[in-house]
């Protein structure tokens, strides 16, 4: 009897321990499955030292975990500017938040399948610059070309800020290697109805845009190689054409604070607006200061443009930063000097 009682006590203890483990696991899962929300507000004063304008961008986001393997993401943007005219007649657009007034636009609405720790797949509405051209060094700079090389964005009406498109995206990520590939509707949009609505997918009318990229990481340095193929109507002519392009850029860490940046993009079609883009720069981090210098060259519409950006991002808190920027842009025979003061709040 004593041995039977002992066995019963042991079984009861194991059951209680198992229940406790399951309850703890359930609590952990409930925490991990809680939705998360984000807010990013960017305010920018721009001046060409003759007149000034004010641009504001509000981005809202939410992520809902449907299970441990499936999630749903939503994001939107709203933009307001005091003047829709450009301060400079530059070809690349010196500010990556420069846009017309947009009361509300849906930028992300995707279902993601987290296949395992390395593989994921999503389908839905998204911008390509959410996944491409968004590395740490490039993201410091405000020039639009650092968020999407003009060998793509100046040639094809694809889904880059502020427009989005329906697409599918696959990603593979491990410690030193990341591979991604995407297929999008060929024309980006932000409206909810009509010919240019964001829910539209029409390869015959809008074309298709396929792209992929490989990233190699080594000792905090990053090396990227990518290619894309656009099949649809080009910006400047109402006819179907194929527009292949390649790009490469590297972020070489020299010291814990200093990184060198080199970028190149090439489009192969002889009739393209922009065939080549190249840039060199550096970033340096000291305490809460991020310094950056980037200079690039491109040729668009048979016009040469050199653009140089000098910037310093001051991280005041984990949520607030201030970033003064100076742009010196030489477009053909015209030189513009643009000053920018950017405020960013991220919650």
Over which residues does each language-model region extend?
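Residue-level signature of outer-membrane beta-barrel architecture
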Residues: 26, 62-66, 112-113, 125, ...
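Transmembrane beta-strand segments of Gram-negative outer membrane beta-barrel proteins
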Residues: 26-48, 72-74, 143-144, 150, ...
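Outer-envelope beta-barrel architecture signal
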Residues: 27-37, 66-72, 117-121, 166, ...
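Transmembrane beta-barrel strands of outer-membrane/channel proteins
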Residues: 35-43, 74-78, 121-127, 181-185, ...
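Solvent-exposed loop/turn segments connecting transmembrane beta-strands
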Residues: 47-52, 128, 160, 204-206, ...
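Outer membrane beta-barrel
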Residues: 55-186, 276-279, 290-296, 300
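Detector for outer-membrane/organellar transmembrane beta-barrel domains
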Residues: 68-69, 176-182, 215-300
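Outer-membrane beta-barrel "beta-signal"
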Residues: 335-347
């Amino acid at each position: 009897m004593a041995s039977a009682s002992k066995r019963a006590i042991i079984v009861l203890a194991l059951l209680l321990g198992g229940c406790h483990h399951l309850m703890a696991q359930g609590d952990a899962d409930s925490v991990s499955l809680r939705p998360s929300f984000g807010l990013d507000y960017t305010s920018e004063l721009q001046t060409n030292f003759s007149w000034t304008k004010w641009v504001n961008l509000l981005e809202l986001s939410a992520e809902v975990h449907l299970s441990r393997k499936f999630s749903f993401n939503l994001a939107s943007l709203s933009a307001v500017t005091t003047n829709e005219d450009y301060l400079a007649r530059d070809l690349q657009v010196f500010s990556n938040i420069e846009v017309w007034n947009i009361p509300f636009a849906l930028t992300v609405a995707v279902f993601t399948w987290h296949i395992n720790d390395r593989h994921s797949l999503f389908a839905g509405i998204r911008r390509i610059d959410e996944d491409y051209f968004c590395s740490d060094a490039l993201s410091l700079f405000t020039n639009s070309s650092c968020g999407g090389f003009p060998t793509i964005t100046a040639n094809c009406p694809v889904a880059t800020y502020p427009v989005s498109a329906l697409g599918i995206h696959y990603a593979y990520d491990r410690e030193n290697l990341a591979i991604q590939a995407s297929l999008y509707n060929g024309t980006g949009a932000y409206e909810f109805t009509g010919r240019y609505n964001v829910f539209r997918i029409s390869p015959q009318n809008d074309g298709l845009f396929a792209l992929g990229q490989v990233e190699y990481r080594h000792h905090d340095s990053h090396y990227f190689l990518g290619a894309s193929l656009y099949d649809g109507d080009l910006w400047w002519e109402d006819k179907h054409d194929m527009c292949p392009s390649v790009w490469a850029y590297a972020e070489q860490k020299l010291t814990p604070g200093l990184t060198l940046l080199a970028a190149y993009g090439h489009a192969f079609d002889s009739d393209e607006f922009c065939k080549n883009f190249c840039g060199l720069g550096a970033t340096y981090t000291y305490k809460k200061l991020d310094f950056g210098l980037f200079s690039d060259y491109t040729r668009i519409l048979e016009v040469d443009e050199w653009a140089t950006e000098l910037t310093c991002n001051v991280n005041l808190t984990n949520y607030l930063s201030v970033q003064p920027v100076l742009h010196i842009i030489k477009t053909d025979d015209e030189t513009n000097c643009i000053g920018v003061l950017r405020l960013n709040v991220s919650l």
